[in-house]
Amino acid sequence: MSDERRLPSSAVGWLACGGLSLLANAWGILSVGAKQKKWKPLEFLLCTLAATHMLNVAVPIATYAVVQLRRQRPDYEWNEGLCKVFVSTFYTLTLATCFSVTSISYHRMWMVRWPVNYRLSNAKKQAVHTVMGIWMVSFILSALPAVGWHDTSERFYTHGCRFIVAEIGLGFGVCFLLLVGGSVAMGMVCTAIALFQTLATQVGHRADRRTFTVPTIVVEDAQGKRRSSIDGSEPARTSLQITGLVATIVVIYDCLMGFPVLVVSFSSLRADASAPWMALCVLWCSVTQALLLPLFLWTCDRYRADLKAVWEKCVALMANDEDSDNETSLEGSISPDMVLERSLDYSYGGDFVALDRMAKYELSALEGGLPQLYPLRPLQEDRMQYLQGAGRHRCGFPGGQPCFSPAGCSQVPPTRRFSHDDADVWAAVPLPTFLPRWSSGEDLAALAHLMLPAGSDRRRGSLLAFAEDAPPFRPRRRSAESLLSLQPSSLDGGPRHAQDSPPGSPRRRPGPGARSASVSLLPDAFALTAFEREPQALRRVPAPAQPFPAARDSAEPAEVPTPPGGRTQRSQGRRAARTHVGPLQSSLSASWGEPGGLHAAGCGSISSFLSSPSESSGYVTLHSDSLGSAS
């Protein structure tokens, strides 16, 4: 009877301590939020524990205290609904508190024992899921007594409100004991591991300064706003403080709530009865632990905030305007110009073309059949410089002195420098579509100036006449009259060398001996479109064939073209390399441009064209063993 009288007298203390606990825990939550720029898993769990304490003292304990004060009147008694609400909320919050403490110890152990895995496993998301699971399990189990899982012989809400587990039912009491006991044991084990690991790390830092640390990784957008980050290793002092805080919370909870609840529950189940001191013990332990948590947070420098910081945090929370939402969104603060300032990669026919980062490109040129990914602004200037300047630098235009300035090579677009000899490109696109892009009349004129001598017997249909009369961008004719066949020089004719020949392609197939200068615009096989009308142009027997003249290595200096009979020295290596093409030289044609054929030239050429009859049609196909050919 004396214990029952103590319940109303203790109600005032519960209300006073409960109000103080509400303010202290609210301050603790604001302090933790003010000291941290972003929510971390451990801080989130600590704030969840503080919120659980606030709910515990605000709802069930305050309700019980008010009812005990009202019971001093003889006409007031507990009703069934109010008792069920009290029992459900009290045990829900008790289990949630127990599980929250265990999850805090587990996350701390995970953080100090496996730091890299903890930071790479999205621990914050797991903490949120843990809290959701804690509240779901706690509410389901604690709501069962209110819906019928209780002792039906004498219900706990019949005479007053007896909320001890033995008064509710054996099944509920056993489940409650197992959950609380397992949670307390797991929390103690995790805390011991975390404390041991932290102390071992402290000793390791003192013994070896090269201890592994996790770096801090921050991901920001183009405007410098943080989008995501991975926290690095904590300082030794901070790590020790946080581990000590977690260990203190676990120990205090086990001493003030875990073990007392286990003892009271086990004693009531064993005696199958409840005593007034059991209710006093459980309620006072709940209020005390709710008061101690803010004090523990205050002792840690990491979570201690002054009044100014807390006030600024409150103002920021109350403002919560659209600007803060844009800062946390993924696309709110990204400028549309950023879309154009990223690296672009395009591929065409197996060739990989990497574009600059800040340049804008004309991508509509891809519709023409070639990957012409040139910069948009200097497109025409670079094109004309290459056709008019690079040719003079590399080929030696008439009227222009040959020079080897690197400007000629630097102005060549990548598609012209690296894709001369792609067989797939030649096979996929018709030949006339390449000529306006891959050659020019001035290139032909320069090549003819080097190859053909200045003789009176040269016809108007020759290559030099074509270069003199034709416009710069005249497309090649596709009939048999447009086939080029250059007559080789005599044996005593001196070879012609071209120092200013274009460089070799990176993927050019190797050839025997020194490489000859090239026509970089002629493919392996010419288009045989109009041969039905003039097949005799290909079957005309030329003059007796002689070995082609060869060009020395490209590294040797160039020589001025000489008339027939000028120089008689000949490279033995080149003579041996050209021996195997002798049988094919007898079938070379001598027609170019005009019907009737072309007289034999008096001087050799630096380009070599091999002709072989086709087994199916009998026509002759010209092949080029030149430096820049498409073979």
UniProtKB/Swiss-Prot annotation:
GO terms for cellular component: plasma membrane. Residues 1-11, 63-84, 148-162, 265-276 are extracellular. It is found in: Cell membrane. The chain crosses the membrane at residues 12-32, 42-62, 85-105, 127-147, 163-183, 244-264, 277-297. GO terms for molecular function: G protein-coupled receptor activity. The keyword tRNA processing does not apply. Residues 33-41, 106-126, 184-243, 298-631 are cytoplasmic. The keyword Disulfide bond does not apply. InterPro entries: GCR_153/162, GPCR_Rhodpsn, GPCR_Rhodpsn_7TM, GPR153. It holds the Pfam family 7tm_1. Keywords: Cell membrane, G-protein coupled receptor, Membrane, Receptor, Transducer, Transmembrane, Transmembrane helix. Residues 486-518, 546-590, 603-631 are annotated as: Disordered. Residues 605-617 have a biased composition (Low complexity). It is a multi-pass membrane protein. PANTHER family: G-PROTEIN COUPLED RECEPTOR 153, 162, G-PROTEIN COUPLED RECEPTOR 153-RELATED. Orphan receptor. Belongs to the G-protein coupled receptor 1 family. This is Probable G-protein coupled receptor 153.
